[in-house]
Amino acid sequence: MRRGNIILAELKHTYFAGNQNEFRSPRIASYGCGLIGFADLLLYLMEQDWRTGGAGGLGTRGGKKYEEFISRLDRSFARVYSHIGLNGFSMAIAFNRRARKRGWPYRARWAVPRKKLPEIICEMLENDIPVILSVGPGFHDRRGEHGVALYRNGRRTEVRARDHYVTVIGYEEDPESGERSFRIVSWGKEYRISASEYLNGSTGSIPFLGNLFSNVLYIRKTV
């Protein structure tokens, strides 16, 4: 994966990503990736409101106000549990409650058919909606390594995502090889993951459950 890729779809504005590792709560630092991704998604949509004259978001990620926002979500909308984190179905319910409260024209559900993932991701990005994507259990490559490799600056890093939520902010294609990649944010940094590695990765001994654990929060516009 390298720079100079063809952009197939991407968010229209800068996406600010928080970092769960910066939180003092051991529970959020260890299991809060879904909560952080969910909070950043809400703030991005709140900032869209601000651009169109509505109530805005925080404008940045980090600091006391951001921590307070995360804590309120954890208490009221999207509780993080130790050793479990935040599951996708709870995330969809929490998003729909929040959308109704703010009058947003969106509806969310967890998981879509695996073959439709690229299409759904493109649809959401074209509608300027960040895509929360989970990398679930059962992912491994031919060498037996678990998780999905993360790339930065065109090079494979030593970091791998497994049992983890990331946020897709772009979908790209290498003009020479035709290889496609998802541009993501995680732990407050931007990476890329191979679309084929993610889409074709093992889903474990029970594919149905693997598909549920490795999927997206699908948010569609209702108007």
Residue ranges and their predicted role:
Residues A78-E172, T222:
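Predominantly the structural core of cysteine protease catalytic domains
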Residues Y66-A78, P118-E119, E126-I129, L133-S134, ...:
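Repeat-unit-sized solenoid/scaffold elements
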Residues M1-S90, R97, R156-V159, T222:
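Active-site-adjacent structural segments surrounding the nucleophilic cysteine of cysteine proteases
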Residues Y44, R142-G144, E179:
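Generic domain-boundary/flexible-linker signal
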Residues I7, P105, S181-R183:
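Ser/Thr- (and often Asn-) enriched beta-sheet segments in non-cytosolic proteins
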Residues D40, P137-D141, D174, K189-Y191:
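Solvent-exposed loop/turn segments at secondary-structure junctions
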Residues A149-V223:
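Noncatalytic regulatory segments and standalone regulatory/sensor domains
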Residues R2, E126-D128, G178:
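Short, well-ordered loop/turn elements at secondary-structure boundaries
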